[in-house]
């Protein structure tokens, strides 16, 4: 029995499902999850000492690679001054200044502890600001595990086959209207049915929780126009795409200005951090200055702020996103060529530093219905073949992959060669 197998057996007796977040359990691919001992650069090292080229990146935060010295040193330095104060710090102000500088649509920002907290709080704020109850989200998109958002969710909810989670009261879910991603007609129909009741749209600008599905050219601008027409707020959930697709996020890449933006993952450099922010007049409705309540004991934690500030400072260096995009392009092109050489039908979607693999005969994958028609069983086999080759992909056909600046030509070439051998065995 490997150490991972032994640890998993112990964990299953102590932790529900043996993991602290469902997708880690390998339910989407079968087998025993890897238990990780350490990570550095582009590599993970499991409890048995085996190294893997990592394309999960802690589900997105590790854009600089694992254990980056600037972030590590910032955390050590901050920890020497104390772990948590429950009071404001200078680093919170510096972090807020940096975030609002890098993301120009954010006049003000509030720090929280996770992406779920960010989206949950942004929706509460939108409802409070507009005095409306209903929200629009999109089929296959995931915005955290708040009750109002677990309605036809993506991510682990798709992997588990439970797009509507038990425990979500029908009275909560009835205020969440689910539309089709990349389909403006479905959104207009929702607004026309409830013209004075919809507080906001929340959208992943690149749907990264049904693998990786970029927006069609007119989709995000169309959402902006509909929100303006019906006096609703547009919330762009950049928890995954923020600082990864472009420095100012996917909203800058696609040229769309939201009313509110949600951030997470990269903003913490590997520490638990989320944030939401946007137009000043909307943000000023938050407590303590306004009536919409939001709070958190560990929000703005000094260790997390130090890690995030160090990470964003590095990410903001010139050329970062051009390099990240070029590395992702090389990987995508290589995987497509390898699949074609072995007559394996494959679609690779990619934008910035994220990508998705779809085993399908379709010419493109642009919405949830396309995603669920892909060959999940073939992905499962491919995942384990690649794992045996020392390449760690997301353990679910419904999760995006992530490139980091620590990935070099050697890692990309190894991945492409491993894929060619794996495709040959499918």
From Swiss-Prot:
Stored NCBIfam families: hemL (TIGR00713), PRK00062.1 (NF000818)
E.C. numbers: 5.4.3.8
Pathway info: Porphyrin-containing compound metabolism; protoporphyrin-IX biosynthesis; 5-aminolevulinate from L-glutamyl-tRNA(Glu): step 2/2
Pfam families (alphabetical): Aminotran_3
HAMAP family: HemL_aminotrans_3
One of the record's GO cellular component terms: cytoplasm
UniProt similarity note: Belongs to the class-III pyridoxal-phosphate-dependent aminotransferase family. HemL subfamily.
Modified residues (N6-(pyridoxal phosphate)lysine): 265
Annotated organism of origin: Erwinia tasmaniensis (strain DSM 17950 / CFBP 7177 / CIP 109463 / NCPPB 4357 / Et1/99)
Cofactor(s) of this protein: pyridoxal 5'-phosphate
Reactions it catalyzes: (S)-4-amino-5-oxopentanoate = 5-aminolevulinate
Subunit structure comment from the entry: Homodimer.
Keywords (A to Z) from UniProt: Cytoplasm, Isomerase, Porphyrin biosynthesis, Pyridoxal phosphate
Alphabetized InterPro entries for the sequence: 4pyrrol_synth_GluAld_NH2Trfase, Aminotrans_3, Aminotrans_3_PPA_site, PyrdxlP-dep_Trfase, PyrdxlP-dep_Trfase_major, PyrdxlP-dep_Trfase_small
UniProt keyword Signal present: no
First-listed, main subcellular location of the protein, grouped into a coarse class: cytoplasm
PROSITE patterns (UniProt xref): AA_TRANSFER_CLASS_3
Protein name (database record): Glutamate-1-semialdehyde 2,1-aminomutase
Record lineage: Bacteria, Pseudomonadati, Pseudomonadota, Gammaproteobacteria, Enterobacterales
Molecular function in Gene Ontology: glutamate-1-semialdehyde 2,1-aminomutase activity; pyridoxal phosphate binding; transaminase activity
GO biological process terms, semicolon-separated: protoporphyrinogen IX biosynthetic process
Keyword Protease included in the entry's annotation: no
Domain of life assignment: Bacteria
Compartments, record wording: Cytoplasm
